[in-house]
From Swiss-Prot:
Site feature (Transition state stabilizer) residues: C148
Name of this chain's protein: Methylthioribose-1-phosphate isomerase
Catalytic activity: 5-(methylsulfanyl)-alpha-D-ribose 1-phosphate = 5-(methylsulfanyl)-D-ribulose 1-phosphate
Keywords: Amino-acid biosynthesis, Isomerase, Methionine biosynthesis
Family recorded in the similarity comment: Belongs to the eIF-2B alpha/beta/delta subunits family. MtnA subfamily.
Binding, substrate: R51, G52, A53, R88, Q187, N238, K239
Protein encoded by which gene: mtnA
Active-site residues from the entry: D228
A molecular function (GO) term: S-methyl-5-thioribose-1-phosphate isomerase activity
Amino acid sequence: MNPQPLRPVIYDEGRDVVRVLDQRRLPSEEVWLDLASCDEVVQAIKDLTVRGAPAIGVAAAYGLALESRRGAEPARLREASERLVHARPTAVNLAWAVRRMSRRLGLGPAALLEEAHAIRDEDEAACRRIGALGAALLPPRASVLTHCNAGALATAGYGTALGVVRAAVEGGNPVTVFADETRPFLQGARLTAWELKRDGIPVTLLTDNMAGWLMAQGEIACVVVGADRIAANGDVANKIGTYALAVLAAYHHLPFYVAAPWSTVDLATPDGSAIPIEERGDEEVVTLAGQRIAPAGVPARYPAFDVTPEPLVTAIITERGVVRRPFAPGLAALAAR
């Protein structure tokens, strides 16, 4: 394991900037960007410079702290809060972090920065607890399939789905990972593979259409994914393609685990039909690495997320505990803790 922790969002108090690792440029180069205003944080979230539900929540919290430290009054901070919440509508952690910061808007810059630091620290601690609980579910020497990137890059640090993998390895279970490339943004190919290679964890890259065959051949022991929103009934919104993996896992009788912090659970959303699904521009689908791969004039769809119905989910792993079906009472019980 790499002894240097990977944290994609940092607040530089000396220069009053939010520093983010530009995830659009990985794995070719590691470039850190200094965001000097809340509007720059909003844009970084929109254009996927920083991505992953918990990570954008941390970035938003720091964006509001930054705006306050630069003299913004509460009314202006409330306007900035609205822009942040609407930057990406599916990930509930973003709205959760902004709501939490909003309760302290009138307390001054120091209080807001303290709260942003707390959101960051609590998320990393949650990821480590999720990792420990999830690692206990993995068979010895398991081959784990994951989708998108639910690692340190997507959180304050350590990761959710990849936190489970890291905790297993740290605990002496030499698991290996199959990473879906995750078209069209290639989070699996560019980010998950990069993270795991950095930590010395064996990873094999798959195109998105290979998982079913490898499951049929007995090469995959389980699926572990992250989440952008979990409804009260256990339906899970995550990166597009997750639903298809869950169907395949169910057909092949493989466990399908969802690892996410409690801030991803949205008990105000009754089921997956109420989760807004972000639609991104088709340019991201018809181009690859700056080159057009489809004929000019051919339209494309890009729903950035899908919803996995709760019957396809084996368990939801949060820092508060592991929940199995029926999810509604289990999640409600965890909420009462």
